[in-house]
Amino acid sequence: MGKIIGIDLGTTNSCVSILENGNVKVIENAEGARTTPSIVAYANDGEILVGQSAKRQAVTNPHNTLFAVKRLIGRRFEEDVVQKDIKLVPYKIVKANNGDAWVEAAGKEMAPPQISAEVLKKMKKTAEDYLGEPVTEAVITVPAYFNDSQRQATKDAGRIAGLDVKRIINEPTAAALAYGMDKAKGDHTVIVYDLGGGTFDVSVIEIAEVDGEHQFEVLATNGDTFLGGEDFDMRLIDYLVDEFKKESGMDLKNDPLALQRLKEAAEKAKIELSSAQSTDVNLPYITADATGPKHLNVKISRAKLESLVEDLVKRTIEPCRIALKDAGIDASKIDDVILVGGQTRMPLVQKEVADFFGKEARKDVNPDEAVAMGAAIQGAVLAGDVKDVLLLDVSPLTLGIETMGGVMTALIEKNTTIPTKKSQVFSTADDNQSAVTIHVLQGERKQAAQNKSLGKFDLADIPPAPRGVPQIEVTFDIDANGILHVGAKDKATGKTQSIVIKANSGLSDEEIERMVRDAEANAEEDRKFEELAAARNQGDALVHSTRKMVADAGDKVTAEEKTAIEAAVVALEAAVKGDDKAAIDAKVEELSKVSAPVAQKMYAEQSAEQPQGGAQQAEPEAKHDDVVDAEFEEVKDNNKQ
């Protein structure tokens, strides 16, 4: 069995980790960084860029550079939070046929799981490069407050990326795993406060020693899946736009290129203000009008930034209060506060959290890496490599069905330990009713319409009977991933109907399979692109070395040889400009062939000049084609010396 990797699929950055020889290791990507920007870009030549390379070209390609897509995963286009995002991002958010929020880039409409899959593929490749073997299994983290559709969509993203997702695990729980594995024995209760790029979660977790086993039990969880560092950036961008408008009278809101530059500058300034008291945002040539180019230069103090985002920080405190209440614990009983997510580096966030919980947060947990590390530990538990850990997570939101009068009747209350299974008997609302529709809901409101609809299905062929007589047993079963399976059974006939809840939106199996095929086709395209690039490089090198050889040979080359070589060189140069690898290979072969006699002459002459040359005289025939590259690299080395 191969390794099960742990992936923190973040809104802003992602991270991959593995448990190796009993130690958790965060794996560096090809650029040498331990985290990878969750950014995917579609270049004009069709290439798909992921991570730092996508981030670098965002300013010049804002419409086709997709960031913070995790905020759209598993969401309907009509949702308020999606409508708000449409106004804030330079790329297009569109309505899919099933009503989901999709994105458009490079003229194609794509589902958020497809975009997330590109990031997951990069994480998968990072792990494979390090391990030197294929990786097919992963534990992927999600915000604790993700609903069923969002969890399912994350699992779909894993499938599209070619990963068998062994478990979906909540981010705060993963962070607690990373924190608690090496702690002293004994029971303690921790708060994980996770403020990431796009989401906020808080979980109350009890870490206990039970018969020598680490038991991690989530007592309660709460959060906001549309609050994070991106919102902090947006406040700063709005401020910079307003300041520039006051000074120049020009509005940068409608200029995607300027907005992308502002986004980069705002993120950089925000990070700097975590350690400095003030910083300058200096963007020359941000725009231009009839009078000439305009430059943006604004000085921002830490106090100013804090005043801009104070209400966002305050918004994180109410979920903390609710989580403590649901867990039945007073803030004073919390042993440790663990901060996770890059935004928790902000001094104001740390101060608010310390004030609320009455204690400073721990500084020995890396906020960017703890979640991926916890996912790797859970992967090792599932693989059987770690035996002394038991994880008891909870369902973050109440689950139920719509009953008469548009009421939501709960079957599984929020913060119920999972996996779990609950059944309840319902009946018909009308006489001789032959079918019932089971409408599955998730949320905390009493009115069904105010909650998230997860899906509907029908139980048909109910024998005619007066209302209230038929007995329909509805069963909710939540698996360890927090994904819901629902069944309904007519107790009189034994007839059953069941579904895995995949929302009335979500991706169908056919769509996922098509996206998997697309991803595989992209991988094939990437391989062909690499091979073509290698062939072009080989062609260029051969042209250069052949021309150098002819120049060095001088009058030792006959006019016929010179003409033949020049014709072959020109043909190879033309082939290198094209996209046909086979044509390049053929022209390389041709040039090697026509230049071989000259190479042999040069080699023989050089050997004759050396005292020990006699012993090597028999070699030219054996070397033949390879002689051009090898010989002239060697001459270069001699020249250097």
Curated annotation (Swiss-Prot):
Pfam families: HSP70. Keywords: ATP-binding, Chaperone, Nucleotide-binding, Phosphoprotein, Stress response. It comes from the Bacteria. The keyword Coiled coil does not apply. GO terms for molecular function: ATP binding; ATP-dependent protein folding chaperone; unfolded protein binding. Residues 602-641 are annotated as: Disordered. The keyword Nucleotide-binding applies. Residues 620-641 have a biased composition (Basic and acidic residues). Residues 604-619 have a biased composition (Low complexity). Acts as a chaperone. Belongs to the heat shock protein 70 family. This is Chaperone protein DnaK. It comes from Pseudomonas putida (strain ATCC 47054 / DSM 6125 / CFBP 8728 / NCIMB 11950 / KT2440).
